[in-house]
Regions:
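Conserved hydrophobic/aromatic packing and binding residues within compact polymer-binding modules
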Residues: 8, 22-23, 33, 62, ...
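Short, structured motif recognition centered on aromatic/hydrophobic residues
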Residues: 8, 45, 84, 95, ...
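The alpha-helix within a helix-turn-helix
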Residues: 12, 23, 52, 88, ...
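DNA major-groove recognition helix of helix-turn-helix
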Residues: 12, 37, 47, 55, ...
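DNA major-groove recognition helix of helix-turn-helix/homeodomain DNA-binding modules
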Residues: 46-61, 122-137
Length: 143
């Protein structure tokens, strides 16, 4: 079982939620919630954000990237564009570096930088590793 699913199940148990109740809390169908809990697939970015906001937990902790749950309060999620531009600038990188180094298409990075779409959870992980930052930082939840 993945670290993500183990931790998600812990939060579900701590909050006495059924899969149906979880689905309602995060705005997905019962079937989708069941697939997430049973590792059939990762949640969409929107559903993942709903999970971390509902449980008020660190995205990095829920994904198993850090071992200590943070109990801080988090800011609301912000669009990726401004944050990604700051990461590129702070790391002296260009958009083309990001595309080449992570094998990500120019159309995708354009959409992220202009807030036309959000990265998948897998791409958030790649970006966090690339910029050596937390996923919570990329989500705008921490400064």
């Amino acid at each position: 079982m993945s670290e993500f699913v183990e931790r998600l199940k812990e939060y579900i148990k701590e909050n006495n939620l059924s899969v149906t109740a979880l689905a309602k809390k995060i705005g997905v169908t019962r079937e989708t919630a069941s697939h997430i809990v049973n590792e059939a697939h990762m949640p969409s970015t929107q559903a993942f954000i709903a999970l971390v906001e509902y449980f008020n937990c660190s995205a990095d902790y829920l994904l198993g990237r850090i071992d200590i749950p943070q109990s801080d309060s988090f800011d609301s999620v912000k669009p990726i564009g401004e944050i990604l531009r700051k990461c590129l600038k702070d790391n002296d990188k260009k958009e083309t570096d990001l595309q080449n180094d992570l094998n990500i298409s120019s159309s995708l990075t354009y959409k992220w930088l202009h807030d036309k779409s959000t990265p998948t959870i897998i791409n958030y992980i790649k970006l966090a590793d690339y910029f050596d930052c937390s996923i919570d930082y990329l989500l705008g939840r921490e400064q």
